C-alpha cells in the first residue's frame, strides 16, 4: 500500500508518478486504471518545489584546520550580536547617565576619563543648564553656598552614593550608572 497525499479519496484511480512512467514506457494502453489528461500533465513534488537550503550548519563540512572556515565562523556574544574580537579589544567602559527631568539618557565612556574633573566637564557638555540657572549659580558662588547639580552613582552592590566619595579607580571599577539630581 502506498501513501497518497492529496485531496482525493484514497485509491481513487489516480496513478502515482512511478506507475505513470512505467505504464507509458510499457505500451501505455494496458494499464490498470485509465489515464486522464489532467493527471498526465501534473508535476511531481520534486518537480514542483525546489529543495530548500538548510538553516543550521553543524560544521561537519569544514575541517577545523581550515583558516577560511574559522574566519567565517566567528563567535557572536550578547545581543545585539557583537563579535568576540571586538568585545575582547574592549577598553570601553560605557555607563548610562540620566538627568532628573530629562526624558533622554545618554552614555559616557569612563575609559576616556582619568579624573572626576574630566567627568564633570563631560557631563556639563552633555547636559547644559539654562542661562537663568547659570546666573543663579554665579550669584550663589559669591556667597559661598553653590547649589549645583548633585551627581550620584549606583555601585556594584546596588547602593546609590555621591560621586567623589571614593578614589577614581574604585569608582570607575564599581559604577553601574550615573544620575544627575537638580
UniProtKB/Swiss-Prot annotation:
Coiled coil: none
Sequence motif: EAR-like (transcriptional repression), positions: 3-7
Recorded name of the encoding gene: IAA9
Induction of its expression: Highly induced by auxin.
Quaternary structure and interacting proteins, as annotated: Homodimers and heterodimers.
Family: Belongs to the Aux/IAA family.
Domain PB1: 92-182
InterPro entries noted in UniProt: AUX/IAA_dom, AUX_IAA, PB1-like
Tissue specificity field: Expressed in etiolated shoots and flowers.
Residues covered by region (Disordered): 1-41
Subcellular location(s) of the protein: Nucleus
GO BP: any one term: regulation of DNA-templated transcription
Protein's organism: Oryza sativa subsp. japonica (Rice)
GO CC, alphabetical: nucleus
Transmembrane domains' residue ranges: none
Low complexity bias locations: 32-41
Function of the molecule: Aux/IAA proteins are short-lived transcriptional factors that function as repressors of early auxin response genes at low auxin concentrations.
Domain of life according to the entry: Eukaryota
Chief subcellular location: nucleus
Keyword terms, alphabetized: Auxin signaling pathway, Nucleus, Repressor, Transcription, Transcription regulation
Pfam families per the UniProt record, alphabetical: AUX_IAA (PF02309)
Protein name (database record): Auxin-responsive protein IAA9
Amino acid at each position: 500500500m502506498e501513501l497518497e497525499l492529496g485531496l482525493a479519496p484514497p485509491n481513487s484511480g489516480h496513478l502515482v508518478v512511478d506507475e505513470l512512467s512505467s505504464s507509458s514506457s510499457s505500451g501505455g494502453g494496458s494499464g490498470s486504471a485509465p489515464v486522464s489528461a489532467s493527471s498526465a500533465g501534473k508535476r511531481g513534488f520534486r518537480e514542483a518545489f525546489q529543495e530548500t537550503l538548510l538553516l543550521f550548519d553543524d560544521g561537519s563540512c569544514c575541517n577545523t584546520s581550515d583558516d577560511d572556515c574559522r574566519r567565517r565562523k566567528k563567535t557572536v556574544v550578547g545581543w545585539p550580536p557583537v563579535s568576540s574580537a571586538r568585545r575582547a579589544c574592549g577598553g570601553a567602559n560605557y555607563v548610562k547617565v540620566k538627568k532628573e527631568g530629562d526624558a533622554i539618557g545618554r552614555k559616557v565612556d569612563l575609559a576616556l576619563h582619568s579624573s572626576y574633573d574630566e567627568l564633570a566637564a563631560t557631563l556639563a557638555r552633555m547636559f547644559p543648564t539654562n542661562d537663568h540657572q547659570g546666573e543663579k549659580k554665579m550669584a550663589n558662588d559669591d556667597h559661598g553656598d553653590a547649589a549645583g547639580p548633585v551627581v550620584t552613582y549606583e555601585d556594584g552592590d546596588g547602593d546609590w552614593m555621591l560621586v567623589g566619595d571614593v578614589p577614581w579607580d574604585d569608582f570607575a571599577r564599581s559604577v553601574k550608572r550615573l544620575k544627575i539630581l537638580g
